[in-house]
A protein has these predicted regions:
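Glycine-biased, small-residue-rich flexible motifs in mid-sequence functional cores and linkers
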Residues: 2-213
Length: 213
């Protein structure tokens, strides 16, 4: 589950609900631990009692952004934090687009929930297509810049997904005994603001949200 660092309240809430329910339904949520969609998806997966994986663009001992050290520890306890870079490697900008190929490679399906036309999540989407992975995008407001990237993906053939069931239904037969939609009936969605706060992530319903320490 990937997307922009900036986000609208619509994008944040749908990201949280979908990642939460995907985790309950048996999916492992993979993302990059960045601000915005990445951290929301990881926190939601943990709240859903599921597994989550974070792929870093830095050394394993250099968590970036630093505000997500607490979240990184939570991810490690519920899945894994991994990187191809040696310890001590700083988070240079060029590392993140390269890192995105690993996120796509580890995934059976990639969901982009919020993206401008310049979002790095579109790089992950291109890797997913090149690797033959399922590609989903969340439809949004066509005049919102944070939805222009997802609109582009939909025009280029990505599947529309507005809830976790859209993805789980498509993969239930491929993962028998793992994907289970009935679990969604037993577990209501956790409260987003409270869950994000427990991971050290501030949410104020803005398009750009300063993260707490």
């Amino acid at each position: 589950v990937v997307g922009s660092r900036d986000y609208s309240e619509y994008g944040a809430r749908l990201t949280f609900e979908m990642a939460h329910d995907l985790a309950i339904g048996g999916a492992t949520i993979i993302s990059g631990l960045a601000y915005g969609v990445d951290s929301i998806a990881a926190s939601a997966a943990i709240a859903g009692g599921g597994r989550t994986v974070a792929v870093l663009g830095s050394g394993i001992d250099v968590i970036y952004p630093r505000e997500h050290v607490k979240l990184a520890r939570q991810v490690a306890a519920h899945g894994a934090v991994m990187t191809e870079y040696p310890p001590g490697t700083r988070p240079f900008g060029g590392h993140f687009p390269v890192r995105n190929r690993i996120i796509a490679a580890l995934s059976h399906a990639v969901l982009v929930t919020s993206a401008s036309l310049h979002s790095g999540s579109l790089i992950t989407a291109r890797y997913a297509k090149a690797q033959g992975k399922q590609l989903y995008a969340l439809p949004g407001n066509v005049i919102d810049p944070l939805c222009e990237g997802t609109a582009l993906l939909l025009r280029e053939g990505a599947r529309a997904a507005v809830c976790a069931e859209d993805i789980l239904n498509a993969n239930e037969k491929a993962f028998p005994g793992i994907v289970n939609l009935f679990r969604l009936l037993e577990h209501p969605t956790a409260p987003m603001e409270q869950t994000l706060g427990a991971s050290g992530i501030a949410f104020r319903g803005q398009k750009r949200v300063k993260q707490s320490s």
